[in-house]
């Protein structure tokens, strides 16, 4: 018998298949189980990497002997198999947590109830336009774990849902963004808004003094919870209702972005995305770009030329 750590992946979608490939690349004993049917492309990927898997059922003896479980975000904690795993005391993590262990890239991570996909896409575009070597993942595009296994990027822009954050513990973003928080997915959080808010704020739990936390200071739910927690990160609010010394705000017909000693002004009429909500998204993206060291001219040009594209 070899003593390789056994990783069992539950769920054979984009997230699970990617996590299984990363586990294989890292030399673990890997098994993937999906209670439903696995899509042909993901089954083909698992076969290509010679990863054993099952679909249509869960075989307990092949799962409950795991050293660690990587759970796909769509599986609720209330699922019978998850309950059995928890009773055994087997550690459950998300694909994001797993991939983060092996990724040395700078990570810009975005969560929120609304606007996170647009904001993620904007930031990815900004970094690409700046000529940076950047990957896109999380809840959008290719599996983050699969990219960590098979590619090399200096930066990742990751859209992360509350379900993905639920099983993150040590994962460390360099820039964390919460676009806003409104009641959503409450069935997964015991119909308690506070539980959902705490899930979103998990994105901030490992931030360090040199990191940045970008948030909507016009969002009462976000501010209420922010006042209850301690974070060492640099706080960069964005707002359409007041002016801030550090962060982004509206000044008549333009967005003003202030980061450290620098200021970037962007006229609203130049933004490629219209609507008040997209002003917020553009503010968050511009702040992330400034914190990454991107030139003002590139930020302005990118926000003027961005066109929403389908990444999935």
Language-model features: locations:
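Adenine nucleotide phosphate-binding catalytic loops in nucleotide-utilizing enzymes
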Residues: 4-5, 10-12, 190-197, 232-312
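Glycine-centered flexibility sites
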Residues: 11-16, 56, 74, 112-115, ...
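Phosphate-binding loop of NTP-binding sites
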Residues: 4-6, 24, 61-64, 73-217, ...
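Surface-exposed charge patches
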Residues: 21, 44, 83, 125, ...
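Short linear Ser/Thr-Pro motifs
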Residues: 15, 33, 72, 113, ...
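Short amphipathic alpha-helical face segments that pack within enzyme cores
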Residues: 18, 122, 143-146, 283-287
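Residues in the short beta-alpha loop(s) of Rossmann-like NAD(P)-binding domains
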Residues: 13, 36, 140, 218-219, ...
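N-terminal leader/targeting and accessory segments in enzymes
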Residues: 1-94, 98, 274, 292-297, ...
